[in-house]
Curated annotation (Swiss-Prot):
NCBIfam families registered for this protein in UniProt: PRK00668.1 (NF001908)
Sorted UniProt keywords: ATP-binding, Cytoplasm, Kinase, Magnesium, Metal-binding, Nucleotide metabolism, Nucleotide-binding, Phosphoprotein, Transferase
Name of the protein in its database record: Nucleoside diphosphate kinase
EC numbers, comma separated: 2.7.4.6
Length: 147
C-alpha cells in the first residue's frame, strides 16, 4: 500500500481549514495513518525544501512555512500520491481545476494552503523528516471493502 506526506500549511491552519481538508481526503476513501499539529523550525524547513536552496523565493518560502503551525499527515492507499496531488490541484490556485483544494481555499501561489509529496521518493523522505515510525499507525477502516 502506497503512502504519501501531505501538510496543511500555516495559512490553512490559521484559517481553520484542517477539518474540511481532512474530511475531503477521507471522503475520497484515503486512509489517514498519522497526523499532528507542529511548528516547523528553520532547520526542518530547510531540510524539507532543500531542493529550493539558492532560488530567489527560498527565504520567503522558509519564512512562510515557519510563520505558524502546520498539520502534517501521512496518507495511505492505492495510488495515493497521484490521487492526493489531483485533489490538491495545481500550485497556482488560479490554474487549479474547480473542486480541488487549492481552487476552493487558496488565493496565491505562495500561500496555497497545502503541500503534498510529488513522488514515491519524496514521500519517503518527507515522511521520515516529519514522523517517527511509531507515529504511523496501521488499522482497518469499515469502508475499505467499498473503496
Amino acid at each position: 500500500m502506497e503512502q504519501t506526506y501531505v501538510m496543511v500549511k500555516p495559512d490553512g491552519v490559521e484559517r481553520g481549514l484542517i477539518g474540511e481538508i481532512v474530511a475531503k481526503i477521507e471522503k475520497k476513501g484515503i486512509k489517514l495513518v498519522a497526523g499532528k499539529l507542529i511548528q516547523i523550525d528553520r532547520k526542518l524547513a530547510e531540510q524539507h525544501y532543500a531542493e529550493h536552496i539558492g532560488k530567489p523565493f527560498f527565504e520567503d518560502l522558509i519564512g512562510f512555512i515557519t510563520s505558524g503551525p502546520v498539520f502534517a499527515m501521512v496518507l495511505e492507499g492505492d495510488d495515493v500520491i497521484k490521487i492526493a496531488r489531483r485533489m490538491m490541484g495545481k500550485t497556482n490556485p488560479l490554474e487549479a481545476d474547480a473542486g480541488t483544494i487549492r481552487a476552493e481555499y487558496a488565493v496565491h501561489t505562495n500561500r496555497n494552503v497545502i503541500h503534498g509529496s510529488d513522488s514515491p521518493e519524496s514521500a519517503k523522505r518527507e515522511i521520515q523528516l516529519f514522523f517517527e515510525p511509531h507515529e504511523i499507525l496501521s488499522y482497518e477502516k469499515a469502508v475499505d471493502i467499498w473503496v
